[in-house]
């Protein structure tokens, strides 16, 4: 196959983007002052360090939600064709559910479901 036209179009697109970015940098106004380099937080001047690390406690809930949400994505198609799969399909989905229940029990035991 001849990809010459595709290469020409791709190079033209890359060149066009490069020209637009260079032109934007060349003609954009620049005014450097002290206020431009300050952190802006809701209009309130910051005191101390503007960035500080803090713990987020809800990420475990989000991960557990995603885990069980993905479970439903696998369960719905299985429920539609459950009769066609036979005993092998039943055993595989039961294994899948047992692993998920064990994961939930582990998370519960470790206190991941408690808001601290």
From Swiss-Prot:
Instruction: Name a single GO cellular component.
Output: NADH dehydrogenase complex
Q: What are the transmembrane regions? A: 3-23, 61-81, 88-108
Q: Which UniProt keywords apply?
A: Cell inner membrane, Cell membrane, Membrane, NAD, Quinone, Translocase, Transmembrane, Transmembrane helix, Transport
Q: What membrane topology was assigned to this protein in its record?
A: Multi-pass membrane protein
Top EC category: translocase
Primary location group: membrane
Catalysed reaction(s) here are: a quinone + NADH + 5 H(+)(in) = a quinol + NAD(+) + 4 H(+)(out)
**A GO molecular function held by the record:** quinone binding
> Nucleotidyltransferase: present as a keyword of the record?
no
Classification via Gene3D superfamilies: NADH:ubiquinone/plastoquinone oxidoreductase, chain 3
Q: Where in the cell is it found?
A: Cell inner membrane
What InterPro entries is this protein classified in? NAD(P)H_OxRDtase_bac/plastid, NADH_UbQ/plastoQ_OxRdtase_su3, NDAH_ubi_oxred_su3_sf
What the entry lists under Pfam families is as follows: Oxidored_q4
EC number of this enzyme: 7.1.1.-
Which PANTHER family is this protein grouped with?
A: NADH-QUINONE OXIDOREDUCTASE SUBUNIT A, NADH-UBIQUINONE OXIDOREDUCTASE CHAIN 3
Describe the family membership recorded for this protein in Swiss-Prot or TrEMBL: Belongs to the complex I subunit 3 family.
Q: How does it assemble?
A: NDH-1 is composed of 14 different subunits. Subunits NuoA, H, J, K, L, M, N constitute the membrane sector of the complex.
Function field = NDH-1 shuttles electrons from NADH, via FMN and iron-sulfur (Fe-S) centers, to quinones in the respiratory chain. The immediate electron acceptor for the enzyme in this species is believed to be a menaquinone. Couples the redox reaction to proton translocation (for every two electrons transferred, four hydrogen ions are translocated across the cytoplasmic membrane), and thus conserves the redox energy in a proton gradient.
Q: What is this protein called?
A: NADH-quinone oxidoreductase subunit A
